[in-house]
Amino acid sequence: MSRFDGRAADPGSYRDRRSEGAFGGGTRAFAPTSKADSAAAAADLDGLPRFEKNFYVESPSVAGMTEEEVEAYRRRREITVEGRDVPKPVREFRDVGFPEYVLQEITKAGFVEPTPIQSQGWPMALRGRDLIGIAETGSGKTLAYLLPAIVHVNAQPILAPGDGPIVLVLAPTRELAVQIQQEATKFGASSKIKSTCIYGGVPKGPQVRDLQKGVEIVIATPGRLIDMIESHHTNLRRVTYLVLDEADRMLDMGFEPQIKKIVSQIRPDRQTLYWSATWPKEVEQLARNFLFDPYKVIIGSEELKANHAISQHVEILSESQKYNKLVNLLEDIMDGSRILIFMDTKKGCDQITRQLRMDGWPALSIHGDKSQAERDWVLSEFKSGKSPIMTATDVAARGLDVKDVKYVINYDFPGSLEDYVHRIGRTGRAGAKGTAYTFFTAANARFAKDLINILEEAGQKVSPELANMGRGAPPPSSGHRDRYRGYGGGRSWS
């Protein structure tokens, strides 16, 4: 039995109260912006019912940890915390007090111990406080906010006709939104907590029907969610648990106005969890607008760095040499494992994929011009191993959760070091080892110094010619490059 109160602990508490009938839908679009309407909205908010959001009871095992033990544990797992009255981390799943059905799913998934972000993030989230989480992709952050969300829903009154969701998760891309929803379905099924995924590029009908039936958890991209609200298909009056996942990526994609519009329609006493892989000033400023007295947990460093489980190899070459180098590399590493190749443009993605297929390689491509059905099919073929080579633009760089990607190849160097780190982060997930290969040309020279910093921080070898580029020297001519092969990650890949 969980240590939470009865409603939060027992899956039957929500299951028994949850009707199978249709009762969702929306009755309220975005509020007008006049002062009179704003005042009316504030008065309306004052009449909203109270809700529960603090469910954490420290286990005897956690309570017994001394300050020295807490500090040693955080230091060993590279956990940095900020905030008032920060709870101690949990070292085992049973210390969290999750409902039994959640623990069963955790066991079934084969998890051995909480990841660092889960270890510290779960007690913070379950206390009902706002939370800033800074952790690299693949750190386990999705469950760090989803499992407390399930506990939160279980403690709330059931949805009534016309109610919108209780939990809202905003994500930058449909791929990430779909993956989050898959986890929500897996861990929420036993308590009849229902979720849906709202994103553009597909017909609205099935999404509208889900909203009208009533769902406790909505995972959405900002644009399609605004469309649904303004069309009166849902509302945000019941949202008391808000998650912004990959906030840095959403800002990169220009979603700040949409995020502000959405958040302005949610009651201010909500709980907000704000997740980002990096912490630039614009991400911090947005957090200041939305969060109150938050905890902050950082896994590793706020400085941009790559996963140390990834072996990084950088090859200096010319644009005209890339394709032959790619083929030579594939001949060397192809063993049936999944290989993800990143391009800068949709056109380049299609061209290289077409050439690879003509040369007999089992390659497919995914990018923003593909229909959702095409993208789903390509991902399915890649995940199953039927087509173990997938080329992609950055639409797949964030949040793409494909197990056992052994190799990432940056055919084109991305437009930022943040995207470089996120691209190569598709491999080396969940404690596995991975390998990333990067083609680096004279046109990328402005990134050399920062790339060297990332390589050195991760203990990777830096080639003399990349080091020279980092000092501002021009790249060597192609006729002199062979003697530098093999640097950048510690082994030859010629």
From Swiss-Prot:
Disulfide bonds: none annotated. A motif (DEAD box) lies at residues 245-248. The keyword Zinc-finger does not apply. Residues 29-39 have a biased composition (Low complexity). ATP binds at A135, E136, T137, G138, S139, G140, K141, T142. It comes from the Eukaryota. Residues 325-470 form the Helicase C-terminal domain. Its EC number is 3.6.4.13. GO terms for molecular function: ATP binding; ATP hydrolysis activity; mRNA binding; RNA helicase activity. Residues 1-39, 465-494 are annotated as: Disordered. It catalyses: ATP + H2O = ADP + phosphate + H(+). SUPFAM superfamilies: P-loop containing nucleoside triphosphate hydrolases. The keyword Protease does not apply. A motif (Q motif) lies at residues 91-119. Residues 1-20 have a biased composition (Basic and acidic residues). It is found in: Nucleus. CDD domains: DEADc_DDX5_DDX17 (cd17966), SF2_C_DEAD (cd18787). Belongs to the DEAD box helicase family. DDX5/DBP2 subfamily. ATP-dependent RNA helicase involved nonsense-mediated mRNA decay and ribosome biogenesis through rRNA processing. This is DEAD-box ATP-dependent RNA helicase 20. It comes from Oryza sativa subsp. japonica (Rice). The lineage of its organism: Eukaryota, Viridiplantae, Streptophyta, Embryophyta, Tracheophyta.
